[in-house]
């Protein structure tokens, strides 16, 4: 079953400031060089990249990214010869993207009610967005289904409730939450971490056909799932990790021990390729 993730309220409020940090970092990369930095990460480290090349590499497709952030995946899809459109409900990432590429097709809107007609897109992508709806992801999936053409592709990534989380991270987090509540500190909901069965159920109920399912993470030696888990634990003790995904001695030891057990054991996300049934 899924795991409902909470963080200290000060941390959840701080998540709203993420793009201020990103904007400050982006000052070092004027113009489209900002996207070049992100594209190198996608090209060299993201497990999802070969799958996107397989399905979208022929180009000529109209693609929606739902919850696009600052548009790094949009830039990648366009590099493959497609036309990308993005929706996000925050001005911060949209301003950041437009500052570096004014021609990007970005609009500010809720991902649950996008400003597009039925059957508009050949494909859609949602990366680490669906988990943030406390009522579940089905409303998001229904909206994406609406704007996709018949048999349109939908790629979706959400945090995965993997074995390392179920048996190690989650019990520690629950103990820390009890401690913080006892100390009178508030906790705020941040996300669900879903199982494969749950995600397949959500998607089938919203008229998507499952094509394939894969782990989502970075290729070794980077492991964004494990890095995020150590960050979640560290926020309770004042630990501030240093980007990009650099482990300390303890993190490197844990990563090395887990790596030989296969990609699913500590995968940060679950990546599903689906088609809209219409």
PLM segments and residue spans:
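Acceptor-substrate binding/catalytic loop of class I
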Residues: 181-198
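Conserved N-terminal segment of class I S-adenosyl-L-methionine
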Residues: 1-116, 123-127, 141, 267-270
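A short hydrophobic/small-residue beta-strand
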Residues: 84, 154-155
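A short glycine-rich, Lys/Arg-flanked "PGG" loop and its adjoining helix->strand segment in the class I
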Residues: 138-150
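A C-terminal cap/extension of S-adenosyl-L-methionine-dependent methyltransferases
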Residues: 169, 173, 201, 211-278
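Residues lining the SAM
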Residues: 127-130, 157
């Amino acid at each position: 079953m899924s795991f409902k993730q909470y963080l200290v309220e000060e941390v959840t409020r701080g998540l709203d400031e993420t793009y201020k940090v990103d904007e400050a970092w982006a000052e070092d990369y004027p113009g489209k060089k900002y996207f070049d930095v992100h594209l190198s990460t996608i090209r060299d480290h993201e497990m999802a990249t070969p799958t996107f090349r397989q399905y979208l590499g022929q180009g000529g497709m109209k693609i929606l990214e739902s919850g696009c952030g600052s548009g790094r995946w949009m830039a990648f899809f366009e590099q493959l010869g497609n036309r990308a459109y993005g929706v996000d409900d925050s001005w911060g990432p949209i301003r950041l993207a437009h500052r570096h590429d004014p021609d990007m097709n970005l609009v500010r809107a809720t991902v649950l009610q996008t400003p597009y007609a039925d059957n508009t897109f050949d494909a859609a992508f949602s990366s680490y967005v669906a988990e943030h709806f406390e009522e579940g992801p089905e409303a998001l999936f229904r909206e994406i289904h609406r704007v996709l053409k018949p048999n349109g592709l939908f790629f979706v990534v959400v945090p995965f409730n993997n074995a390392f989380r179920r048996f190690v991270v989650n019990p520690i987090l629950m103990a820390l939450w009890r401690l913080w509540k006892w100390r009178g500190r508030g906790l705020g909901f941040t996300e669900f971490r879903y199982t494969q069965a749950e995600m397949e159920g959500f998607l089938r109920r919203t008229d998507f056909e499952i094509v394939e399912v894969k782990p989502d993470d970075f290729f070794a030696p980077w492991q964004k799932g494990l890095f995020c888990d150590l960050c979640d634990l560290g926020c309770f003790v004042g630990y501030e990790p240093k980007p990009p995904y650099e482990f300390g001695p303890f993190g490197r030891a844990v990563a090395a021990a887990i790596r030989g057990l296969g990609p699913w054991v500590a995968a940060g996300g679950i990546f599903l390729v689906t088609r809209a049934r219409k």
